[in-house]
């Protein structure tokens, strides 16, 4: 979800959902904003308790998201930042993180909020971090999307294996 045309769903009661947030540690200022946005969404959706787990970097998000999924959480939100440098490393990390998180979602039938910023520079990340003056709040958006997806799956009678 990005910029113009993004949905603005009204928060629904998700107090019955078990939620875990896994967050990378690189780019502290941006990560603090993403985590704060996720926590605002959890409050808006009436999720009283959640688990926050920190990992070193974005690459580690998928394996920890999978471990949390196996602990019977209804929702996992993954937050991280990858900023393009001068080597192909950016492309490999972004692809691996995306594919890993999609695998967790599909293999576990579990909503995984994708709050991983893949940016060309620091300013793009700051603009999306939900900080004062930011244009977007991707931590909030990723959490909201995952919660709404979990609610939809519950309404469909779908449960994780």
Swiss-Prot record:
Annotated Gene3D superfamilies: Lumazine/riboflavin synthase
Catalytically driven reaction(s): (2S)-2-hydroxy-3-oxobutyl phosphate + 5-amino-6-(D-ribitylamino)uracil = 6,7-dimethyl-8-(1-D-ribityl)lumazine + phosphate + 2 H2O + H(+)
GO terms classed as biological process: riboflavin biosynthetic process
UniProt KW Transferase keyword: yes
Gene Ontology CC terms, in alphabetical order: cytosol; riboflavin synthase complex
Pathway: Cofactor biosynthesis; riboflavin biosynthesis; riboflavin from 2-hydroxy-3-oxobutyl phosphate and 5-amino-6-(D-ribitylamino)uracil: step 1/2
GO molecular function annotations of the record: 6,7-dimethyl-8-ribityllumazine synthase activity
EC id: 2.5.1.78
Chain positions recorded as 5-amino-6-(D-ribitylamino)uracil binding sites: 26, 58-60, 81-83, 114
Top-level taxon in the UniProt lineage: Bacteria
InterPro entries, A to Z: LS (IPR034964), LS/RS (IPR002180), LS/RS_sf (IPR036467)
Active-site positions on this chain: 89 (proton donor)
Binding positions for (2S)-2-hydroxy-3-oxobutyl phosphate per the UniProt entry: 86-87, 128
Keyword check for Transferase: yes
One Pfam family hit: DMRL_synthase
Keyword tags: Riboflavin biosynthesis, Transferase
Family: Belongs to the DMRL synthase family.
Function as written in the Swiss-Prot or TrEMBL entry: Catalyzes the formation of 6,7-dimethyl-8-ribityllumazine by condensation of 5-amino-6-(D-ribitylamino)uracil with 3,4-dihydroxy-2-butanone 4-phosphate. This is the penultimate step in the biosynthesis of riboflavin.
Protein name: 6,7-dimethyl-8-ribityllumazine synthase
Gene this protein is translated from: ribH
């Amino acid at each position: 979800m990005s910029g113009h045309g993004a949905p603005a769903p009204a928060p629904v009661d998700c107090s019955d959902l078990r939620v875990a947030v896994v967050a990378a540690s690189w780019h502290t200022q941006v990560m603090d904003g993403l985590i704060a946005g996720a926590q605002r969404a959890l409050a808006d959706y009436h999720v009283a308790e959640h688990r926050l787990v920190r990992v070193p970097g974005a690459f580690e998000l998928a394996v920890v998201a999978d471990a949390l999924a196996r602990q019977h959480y209804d929702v996992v939100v993954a937050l991280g930042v990858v900023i393009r440098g001068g080597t192909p490393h950016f492309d490999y990390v972004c692809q691996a993180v995306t594919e890993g998180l999609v695998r967790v979602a599909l293999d576990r039938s579990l909503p995984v909020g994708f709050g991983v910023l893949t940016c060309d520079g620091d300013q793009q990340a700051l603009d999306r971090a939900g900080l004062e003056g930011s244009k977007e709040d991707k931590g909030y958006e990723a959490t909201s999307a995952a919660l709404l997806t979990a609610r939809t799956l519950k309404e469909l009678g779908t449960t994780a294996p």
